[in-house]
C-alpha cells in the first residue's frame, strides 16, 4: 500500500502537466488571432436545406459557427478592410450561417499553418478557400466546391511563345499557399519554381520581369489582372492540374458539420452561384469555364498536328485589331483569340498586314491559316469560309462638323463617300444611294482622314469603329451624323474553303463563349486607351524624324568643320585653363585670410595656406577629412559643433551665413567674422560649402573700448543734466522771493517814481536771470532726449502777431521799424506747440532787433496747403551788421556768441537761444536756415510741414485787454499756504492777499496738517521739499483722510509748489494725490489763472465775492464758457441763444449720465466715443477747461484694457465741470433780457 501512496502525487503532477501543455497549445493560436466582422452579400437568399431533426437540434445547441481565415488575403475570396471581412468565401459563409440559423464568427490568423492548427485544436469550426491539393488533407474533410478552381498559365504581354505543356527552362512564380511543391514538380519538372507570399506578389514578379510564368487559380488571377495588370500580362493557356475546386475544410472527425455545410451548398441554385461570381466582377475578365467543347477525333488529331495557327490581321482595324506603340497586338479580336486559345489549347501566331487585299493574299498563299477579323461578304464566300460572327454592329455616317455637312443618308446624293476598299457595304450603298460618289481607302483610319482633310464629305463605317476614331483622333473635327439604313455589319473569323477541321474547331469554341463575355469585351474596347499606330497619330513624329535626319546630315557636315577648329583651339584652351588654374591658386593662397571648400558631407576639398598656417598643419592632415576627423581645433566637442553647424545650418538651409563668433583655438579665444556659402551645380543640386573667416579680435577690442567710452560720456552727460536741474532749483528758490516782491512793489501804487525805476530794473534783471535758467534747462532736456512737444489746434495768424506785439515797444525805443508780412492762403488752424513756436519766433525777432541799429526788421509768414498738411515758412530779416560764415558755423552751438558791430560792442545773452530754436524746429520736423553777410543783414528762415485742422465753428477770442493790473478771481477762497522758506511763504501769502483770498500760512508739514484738521480749506498750496513731513507726504495724508468713511467736508484742491524743474516733477505731484503743480517763481496773473481753472474744474460751492456777485453785463465773460463765442455764433439772436443753450444743457446732462454708466461697465471704446461727443458740445460754448478734460479722457480711454485711476479722476472732473457749466449757463441766461419771439 505504501507504493500507490507514493505514486499518487507523481501521477497527479504528470496529469497536470499534460493538461497545462494542452491548454497552452489551444491558447496559443487563439491569442494570435484577430476577430473580424463578417460582411456578406446584402440580400442573403433562402434555400431549402434537407436536414434531419438531430442535425437541427445539434445546430441549435451550437449556435455559433466559427470560420478561420489567414493572411495574406486571397482576393476575391478573402478581402480584409480593417476589422471587416468580405469576399466570395464571406458571401458563401453568410449564406450557410443564415440558412442554418447560426451566428457567424470570423477569426483571422497570421499564417495558413496557424489557421490549420486552430482547426485541429477546435478553436475554429471550418476554414475557407482550400482545394483538393492541400498537403494536409488527411486531417481535413472538404465540402463540396462552392467555386471552380481552374489553374491558368499567365505570361507577360509580348513574351515569346513557349509551349504550355512543359514550360522548360521557365521561372515559374506560384503563391506558396496555392499548390503543393510536389504537384507542380510533377506537372512541370523542367521549370524553376519560385514561391511568393501571395498571388499578387507572384503575378507582379511576372509583370516586372522577375519571373517568366505565373500559375494561379482562374478567379484570383482574373481579379488581379483586371484590377492592376491588364496591360502587363495575359492568360495564355490552362494549366492541366486538377484541384477539385475551392471548398470549406473541417476536421476529419466532424462529419455532422460537413454534412450540414454540404446540404446548404448543394441547395444553392446555379443562378445564385453566377450572381456571386458576377458580384465580384469575375464574369467577363477572362473565361472561367475551361471545359473544352466536344471535339471529334479528327479535330483533336488536327489540333495535335497543328499546335500553332497563323492568324492574319489588319495592322489597323481599330478597335477590332490594332498594334499598340509597344508592338503588342490588341483589340476585340485579340481578346476573342485569347478565349479561343483557352478553349482549344492552340497557340495563335499573329501576322500583321496593311490592307484587306494583302490579308486575302496571305490566306490564299497559305502563309496564314485564318483571318482574325473580316467583314462577312457574300462575294468572298466563294473562296473563304466564315465562322459564326462574334460582332454584329450597325453602319453609321461620319461627317465633318460643318453646317453644310450631310446630316443623314438622304443628303448623300451628289456627295463623296469614303469606304474601305472591297468593303461589303460598297455594293449595298451604291444600290441604295446611286447618286453618291464612292471613293475607297486602304483602311478605316485613312478613310476618316480623307473626310477630315476635305477629300470626302462622309465616311460609312461600323458604329464601334466610327466612335473609336472620332472620339480618339478627330474630336471637334468629325462627328457621327446618323445611322445608315443598311444591314448590320458582321465581323467573323475566316479560313480558306479547304480548312474544314479548323473552321469546325473555331465554331465550336466560339459557341462555347457566352454572349456576356463577348459583350464585356466589346464594352471594354469601346473606351479603350490603347494607342494604335496610325499615320494621323504619328505624322508629326514622322515629319520630326525626317527633319531630324536632315538636321543630322547638316550636323555631320558641320562636325567636320568643328573638329578642325577644335584641334586649333584645344591648345589655346589648355594654355588658358592652365593660366586660370594658376591664377586661382595664387588668388586663394595669396589671400591672407583662411579660405576652405568642403563637400556636402563636410569633407575638405580645398584650402589655402592661411588656413593651414592658422592651425599649424599640412594639407595632407585636412584634405578629404571632416572637422572632427582632422581635429585641428584641438577640442573634439568644438570640432563636432562646427561640423554640425556646416551640415545642419548651412548645407540643409542652403542659405549663406555671415556672423561673428568667439572661437577658442589651442587655448586662445579669438573673435572672428565667419562666412559660409553653399554652392551647387548647374542643376541646382547642392555640392558643398565655401567658407572662411577674418580675425577681428583687435577690432572687437576697439569697439568694446569705444562702447565703454560712450557709456562714460553718457554718464557724464546725465550728471551734467542732474547738476543743471539741481542748480536751477537752488537758484529759483530765492529768485521766487525776489521776483514776487518786486512784482508786488510794482503793482502797488506809489508816488516815489525813482524807487519804481530801480525796482523795475531789478525786476527785469531777475526775469532775465530766470530766462537764463529756463534756457539752460531746455538745452539739458533736449540733450537728454526727454523734451516733449504739446501740439494743439492753433490759429496760424496768432503766432506772428503775438511776437510783433511783444517786441513792438522795444523796436520803437531803438527807432527800428518792425514789420509783419503775411501771405497765408487756404490755411487756418494747424496742429503746433504754440508756446515753443512763440519761443522760437521771440528769439529770432529779439536777436534781429538786438543786432540792428537802424533800418527795419521784417517778420514774414507764408503758408500754402499741401494735401492734408500745410507748408509754412517763417522768415525774420533785418538790416543789421550781418554775420560772417565762420561766425555762422559757431552760432548754433550751445553757449556760443559772436560780437555785434564795433559800435554795439559784445553781444549780450547766454548764447543758448539759437541753439535751442534750431533744436525745437527740428523736433517739430522742420528746418532752420540762416543766410547772412557782413554789412548786408541777416535772414533766418524756418520751414515746417504742419497738419491742418478744420476751422472751428466759433467766434474768435476777444483781444486781450491791456490792463495795468491783473484781474482778480471771481471767488474768495480759503487757502492754506505751506513753505519752510520764509521769504517764499511771505511772498505767496501777499500774492494771495492781493488777489482777495483768505490765507492761513504754515511753515512746516506738521503745522499744516494740524491746521487742515481744525479748519475747512478750499485750496492747499504746499512746497514739495520740506524737512519732516514733505509736501508729497502731506498730500497723501490729506487724501487718505478725505477718503476715510464719515468725512463730511468737500474735497480740497491741492497744489504742489516747487522750484525744481525736473521733467517728472508734475507726475510725482499727481502721484501723491495733488491736483496740479505750480513752479517757482509764479506771477500774480499766472497764480490767478491757475486758481480760476482749479475752481472751474472742482466746481467749488464757495459763495461769490462781492465783485463776482455784482450783476453781470453782456461784456462779462463767465469762467466756464465764452459768452463772446455764443454771441458771435448766434449773431446776438436772443431766441436762438436760449434755444441753443437749452439744447447744450440737455445734451450735456444726458451724455454725462451715459458716460458714467459706460465708465462703470468699463466699456473703454464707448467711453472714448462718448468723450468725443461731449467735446463737440463743449466747443459750441468754448468751454476750454471742459474741452481739455474730454480730450484727455478720449485719448486715455483709447486702447485701455483694464481699470485706470486716471480715467476715474477724469470722469469725476468732467461730471463736476458739466454741472458747473450748466449752473453758469443758466445764471447767464437769467441775467439776459427776455424777448418775445417774433
Curated annotation (Swiss-Prot):
<dbReference type="InterPro" id="IPR001789">
    <property type="entry name" value="Sig_transdc_resp-reg_receiver"/>
</dbReference>
<dbReference type="InterPro" id="IPR036641">
    <property type="entry name" value="HPT_dom_sf"/>
</dbReference>
<dbReference type="GO" id="GO:0005524">
    <property type="term" value="F:ATP binding"/>
</dbReference>
<feature type="signal peptide">
    <location>
        <begin position="1"/>
        <end position="32"/>
    </location>
</feature>
<dbReference type="GO" id="GO:0005886">
    <property type="term" value="C:plasma membrane"/>
</dbReference>
<dbReference type="Pfam" id="PF02518">
    <property type="entry name" value="HATPase_c"/>
</dbReference>
<protein>
    <recommendedName>
        <fullName>Virulence sensor protein BvgS</fullName>
        <ecNumber>2.7.13.3</ecNumber>
    </recommendedName>
</protein>
<keyword id="KW-0812">Transmembrane</keyword>
<keyword id="KW-0843">Virulence</keyword>
<dbReference type="InterPro" id="IPR036890">
    <property type="entry name" value="HATPase_C_sf"/>
</dbReference>
<dbReference type="InterPro" id="IPR035965">
    <property type="entry name" value="PAS-like_dom_sf"/>
</dbReference>
<dbReference type="InterPro" id="IPR049871">
    <property type="entry name" value="BvgS-like_periplasmic2"/>
</dbReference>
<feature type="domain" description="PAC">
    <location>
        <begin position="652"/>
        <end position="708"/>
    </location>
</feature>
<feature type="transmembrane region" description="Helical">
    <location>
        <begin position="542"/>
        <end position="563"/>
    </location>
</feature>
<keyword id="KW-0547">Nucleotide-binding</keyword>
<dbReference type="GO" id="GO:0000155">
    <property type="term" value="F:phosphorelay sensor kinase activity"/>
</dbReference>
<dbReference type="InterPro" id="IPR005467">
    <property type="entry name" value="His_kinase_dom"/>
</dbReference>
<feature type="topological domain" description="Periplasmic">
    <location>
        <begin position="332"/>
        <end position="541"/>
    </location>
</feature>
<dbReference type="GO" id="GO:0009927">
    <property type="term" value="F:histidine phosphotransfer kinase activity"/>
</dbReference>
<dbReference type="Pfam" id="PF00497">
    <property type="entry name" value="SBP_bac_3"/>
</dbReference>
<feature type="modified residue" description="Phosphohistidine; by autocatalysis">
    <location>
        <position position="729"/>
    </location>
</feature>
<keyword id="KW-0732">Signal</keyword>
<keyword id="KW-0472">Membrane</keyword>
<comment type="function">
    <text>Member of the two-component regulatory system BvgS/BvgA. Phosphorylates BvgA via a four-step phosphorelay in response to environmental signals.</text>
</comment>
<keyword id="KW-1003">Cell membrane</keyword>
<feature type="topological domain" description="Cytoplasmic">
    <location>
        <begin position="33"/>
        <end position="307"/>
    </location>
</feature>
<keyword id="KW-0067">ATP-binding</keyword>
<feature type="domain" description="HPt">
    <location>
        <begin position="1133"/>
        <end position="1228"/>
    </location>
</feature>
<dbReference type="InterPro" id="IPR003661">
    <property type="entry name" value="HisK_dim/P_dom"/>
</dbReference>
<dbReference type="Pfam" id="PF01627">
    <property type="entry name" value="Hpt"/>
</dbReference>
<dbReference type="GO" id="GO:0006355">
    <property type="term" value="P:regulation of DNA-templated transcription"/>
</dbReference>
<keyword id="KW-0902">Two-component regulatory system</keyword>
<keyword id="KW-1133">Transmembrane helix</keyword>
<keyword id="KW-0808">Transferase</keyword>
<keyword id="KW-0418">Kinase</keyword>
<dbReference type="InterPro" id="IPR013767">
    <property type="entry name" value="PAS_fold"/>
</dbReference>
<dbReference type="Pfam" id="PF00512">
    <property type="entry name" value="HisKA"/>
</dbReference>
<feature type="transmembrane region" description="Helical">
    <location>
        <begin position="308"/>
        <end position="331"/>
    </location>
</feature>
<feature type="domain" description="PAS">
    <location>
        <begin position="580"/>
        <end position="651"/>
    </location>
</feature>
<dbReference type="InterPro" id="IPR000014">
    <property type="entry name" value="PAS"/>
</dbReference>
<dbReference type="InterPro" id="IPR008207">
    <property type="entry name" value="Sig_transdc_His_kin_Hpt_dom"/>
</dbReference>
<keyword id="KW-0997">Cell inner membrane</keyword>
Amino acid at each position: 500500500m505504501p507504493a500507490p501512496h507514493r505514486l499518487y502525487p507523481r501521477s497527479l503532477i504528470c496529469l497536470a502537466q499534460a493538461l497545462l501543455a494542452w491548454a497552452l497549445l489551444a491558447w496559443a493560436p487563439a491569442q494570435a488571432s484577430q476577430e473580424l466582422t463578417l460582411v456578406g452579400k446584402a440580400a442573403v437568399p433562402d434555400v431549402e436545406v434537407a436536414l434531419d431533426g438531430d442535425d437541427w437540434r445539434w445546430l441549435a445547441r451550437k449556435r455559433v459557427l466559427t470560420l478561420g481565415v489567414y493572411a495574406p488575403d486571397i482576393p476575391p475570396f478573402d478581402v480584409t478592410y480593417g476589422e471587416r471581412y468580405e469576399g466570395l468565401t464571406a458571401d458563401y459563409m453568410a449564406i450557410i450561417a443564415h440558412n442554418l440559423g447560426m451566428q457567424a464568427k470570423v477569426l483571422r490568423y497570421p499564417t495558413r499553418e496557424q489557421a490549420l492548427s486552430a482547426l485541429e485544436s477546435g478553436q475554429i469550426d471550418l476554414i475557407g478557400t482550400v482545394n483538393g491539393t492541400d498537403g494536409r488533407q488527411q486531417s481535413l474533410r472538404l465540402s463540396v466546391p462552392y467555386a471552380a478552381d481552374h489553374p491558368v498559365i499567365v505570361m507577360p504581354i509580348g513574351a515569346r511563345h513557349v509551349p504550355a505543356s512543359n514550360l522548360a527552362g521557365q521561372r515559374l512564380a506560384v503563391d506558396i499557399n496555392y499548390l503543393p511543391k510536389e504537384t507542380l514538380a510533377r506537372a512541370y519538372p523542367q521549370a524553376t519554381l519560385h514561391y511568393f507570399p501571395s498571388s499578387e506578389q507572384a503575378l507582379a514578379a511576372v509583370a516586372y520581369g522577375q519571373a517568366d510564368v505565373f500559375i494561379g487559380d482562374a478567379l484570383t488571377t482574373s481579379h488581379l489582372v483586371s484590377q492592376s495588370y491588364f496591360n502587363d500580362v495575359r492568360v495564355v493557356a490552362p494549366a492541366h492540374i486538377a484541384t477539385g475546386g475551392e471548398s470549406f475544410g473541417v476536421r476529419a472527425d466532424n462529419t455532422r458539420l460537413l454534412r450540414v455545410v454540404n446540404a446548404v451548398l448543394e441547395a444553392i441554385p446555379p443562378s445564385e452561384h453566377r450572381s456571386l461570381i458576377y458580384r465580384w466582377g469575375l464574369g467577363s475578365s477572362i473565361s472561367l469555364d475551361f471545359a473544352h467543347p466536344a471535339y471529334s477525333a479528327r479535330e483533336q488529331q488536327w489540333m495535335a498536328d497543328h499546335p500553332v495557327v497563323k492568324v492574319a490581321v489588319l495592322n489597323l482595324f481599330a478597335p477590332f485589331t490594332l498594334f499598340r506603340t509597344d508592338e503588342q497586338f490588341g483589340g476585340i479580336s485579340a481578346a476573342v483569340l485569347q478565349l479561343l486559345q483557352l478553349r482549344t489549347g492552340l497557340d495563335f501566331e499573329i501576322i500583321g498586314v496593311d490592307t484587306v487585299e494583302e490579308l486575302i493574299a496571305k490566306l490564299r498563299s497559305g502563309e496564314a491559316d485564318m483571318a482574325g477579323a473580316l467583314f462577312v461578304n457574300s462575294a468572298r464566300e466563294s473562296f473563304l469560309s466564315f465562322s459564326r460572327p462574334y460582332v454584329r454592329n450597325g453602319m453609321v455616317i461620319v461627317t465633318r462638323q460643318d453646317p453644310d455637312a450631310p446630316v443623314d443618308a438622304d443628303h448623300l446624293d451628289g456627295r463623296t463617300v469614303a469606304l474601305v476598299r472591297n468593303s461589303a457595304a460598297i455594293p449595298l450603298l451604291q444600290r441604295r444611294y446611286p447618286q453618291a460618289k464612292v471613293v475607297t481607302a486602304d483602311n478605316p483610319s485613312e478613310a476618316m482622314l480623307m473626310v477630315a482633310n476635305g477629300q470626302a464629305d462622309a465616311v460609312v463605317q461600323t458604329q464601334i469603329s466610327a466612335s473609336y476614331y472620332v472620339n480618339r483622333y478627330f474630336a471637334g473635327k468629325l462627328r457621327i451624323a446618323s445611322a445608315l439604313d443598311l444591314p448590320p455589319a458582321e465581323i467573323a473569323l475566316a479560313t480558306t474553303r479547304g480548312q474544314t477541321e479548323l473552321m469546325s474547331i473555331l465554331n465550336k469554341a466560339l459557341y462555347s463563349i457566352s454572349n456576356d463575355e463577348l459583350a464585356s469585351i466589346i464594352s471594354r474596347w469601346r473606351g479603350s486607351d490603347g494607342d494604335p499606330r496610325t499615320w494621323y497619330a504619328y505624322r508629326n513624329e514622322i515629319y520630326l524624324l525626317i527633319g531630324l535626319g536632315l538636321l543630322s546630315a547638316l550636323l555631320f557636315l558641320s562636325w567636320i568643320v568643328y573638329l578642325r577648329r577644335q584641334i586649333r583651339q584645344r591648345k589655346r584652351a589648355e594654355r588658358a585653363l592652365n593660366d586660370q588654374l594658376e591664377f586661382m591658386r595664387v588668388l586663394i593662397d595669396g589671400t591672407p585670410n583662411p579660405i576652405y571648400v568642403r563637400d556636402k558631407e563636410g569633407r575638405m576639398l580645398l584650402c589655402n595656406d592661411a588656413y593651414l598656417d592658422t592651425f599649424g598643419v599640412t594639407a595632407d592632415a585636412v584634405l578629404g577629412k571632416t572637422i572632427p576627423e582632422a581635429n585641428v581645433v584641438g577640442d573634439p566637442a568644438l570640432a563636432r559643433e562646427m561640423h554640425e553647424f556646416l551640415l545642419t545650418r548651412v548645407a540643409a538651409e542652403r542659405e549663406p551665413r555671415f556672423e561673428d563668433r568667439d572661437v577658442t583655438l589651442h587655448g586662445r579665444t579669438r573673435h572672428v567674422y565667419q562666412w559660409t556659402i553653399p554652392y551647387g551645380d548647374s542643376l541646382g543640386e547642392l555640392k558643398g560649402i565655401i567658407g572662411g573667416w577674418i580675425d577681428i579680435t583687435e577690432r572687437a577690442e576697439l569697439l568694446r573700448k569705444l562702447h565703454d567710452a560712450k557709456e562714460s560720456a553718457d554718464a557724464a552727460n546725465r550728471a551734467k543734466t542732474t547738476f543743471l536741474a539741481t542748480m536751477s532749483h537752488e537758484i529759483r528758490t530765492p529768485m521766487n522771493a525776489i521776483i514776487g516782491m518786486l512784482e508786488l512793489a510794482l503793482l502797488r501804487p506809489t508816488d516815489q517814481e525813482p524807487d519804481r525805476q530801480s525796482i523795475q530794473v531789478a525786476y527785469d534783471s531777475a526775469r532775465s536771470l530766470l530766462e537764463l535758467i529756463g534756457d539752460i534747462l531746455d538745452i539739458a532736456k533736449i540733450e537728454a532726449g526727454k523734451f516733449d512737444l504739446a501740439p494743439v489746434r492753433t490759429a496760424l495768424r496768432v503766432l506772428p502777431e503775438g511776437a510783433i506785439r511783444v517786441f513792438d515797444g522795444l523796436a520803437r525805443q531803438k527807432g527800428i521799424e518792425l514789420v509783419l508780412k503775411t501771405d497765408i492762403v487756404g490755411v487756418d488752424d494747424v496742429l503746433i506747440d504754440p508756446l515753443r513756436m512763440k519761443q522760437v519766433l521771440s528769439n529770432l525777432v529779439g536777436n534781429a532787433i538786438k543786432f540792428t541799429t537802424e533800418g527795419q526788421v521784417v517778420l514774414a509768414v507764408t503758408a500754402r496747403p499741401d494735401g492734408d498738411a500745410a507748408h509754412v515758412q517763417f522768415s525774420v530779416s533785418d538790416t543789421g551788421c550781418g554775420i560772417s560764415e565762420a561766425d555762422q558755423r559757431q552760432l548754433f552751438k550751445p553757449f556760443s556768441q559772436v560780437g555785434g558791430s564795433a559800435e554795439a560792442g559784445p553781444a549780450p545773452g547766454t548764447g543758448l537761444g539759437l541753439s535751442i530754436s534750431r533744436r525745437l524746429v527740428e523736433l517739430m520736423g522742420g528746418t532752420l536756415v540762416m543766410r547772412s553777410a557782413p554789412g548786408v543783414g541777416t535772414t533766418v528762415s524756418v520751414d515746417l510741414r504742419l497738419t491742418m485742422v478744420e476751422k472751428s465753428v466759433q467766434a474768435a477770442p476777444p483781444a486781450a485787454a491791456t490792463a495795468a493790473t491783473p484781474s482778480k478771481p471771481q471767488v474768495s477762497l480759503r487757502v492754506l499756504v505751506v513753505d519752510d522758506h520764509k521769504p517764499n511763504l511771505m511772498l505767496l501769502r501777499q500774492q494771495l492777499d492781493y488777489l482777495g483770498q483768505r490765507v492761513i500760512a504754515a511753515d512746516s508739514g506738521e503745522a499744516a496738517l494740524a491746521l487742515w484738521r481744525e479748519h475747512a480749506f478750499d485750496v492747499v498750496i504746499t512746497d514739495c521739499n520740506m524737512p519732516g513731513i514733505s509736501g508729497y507726504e502731506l498730500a497723501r495724508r490729506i487724501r487718505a483722510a478725505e477718503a476715510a468713511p464719515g468725512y463730511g467736508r468737500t474735497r480740497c484742491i491741492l497744489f504742489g509748489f516747487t522750484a525744481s524743474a525736473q521733467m517728472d516733477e508734475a507726475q510725482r505731484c499727481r502721484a501723491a494725490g495733488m491736483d496740479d503743480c505750480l513752479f517757482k517763481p509764479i506771477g500774480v496773473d499766472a497764480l490767478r489763472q491757475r486758481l480760476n481753472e482749479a475752481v472751474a474744474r472742482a466746481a467749488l460751492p464757495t459763495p461769490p465775492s462781492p465783485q463776482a456777485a455784482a450783476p453781470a453785463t453782456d461784456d462779462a465773460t463767465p469762467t466756464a464758457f465764452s459768452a463772446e463765442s455764443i454771441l458771435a455764433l448766434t449773431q446776438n439772436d436772443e431766441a436762438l441763444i436760449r434755444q441753443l443753450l437749452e439744447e447744450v444743457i440737455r445734451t450735456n446732462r444726458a451724455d454725462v449720465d451715459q458716460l458714467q454708466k459706460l465708465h462703470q461697465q468699463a466699456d473703454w471704446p464707448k467711453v472714448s466715443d462718448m468723450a468725443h461727443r461731449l467735446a463737440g458740445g463743449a466747443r459750441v460754448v468754448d468751454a476750454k477747461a471742459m474741452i481739455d478734460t474730454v480730450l484727455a479722457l478720449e485719448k486715455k480711454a483709447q486702447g485701455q484694457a483694464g481699470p485706470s485711476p486716471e480715467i476715474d479722476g477724469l470722469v469725476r472732473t468732467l461730471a463736476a465741470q458739466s454741472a458747473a457749466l450748466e449752473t453758469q449757463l443758466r445764471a447767464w441766461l437769467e441775467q439776459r433780457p427776455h424777448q418775445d419771439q417774433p
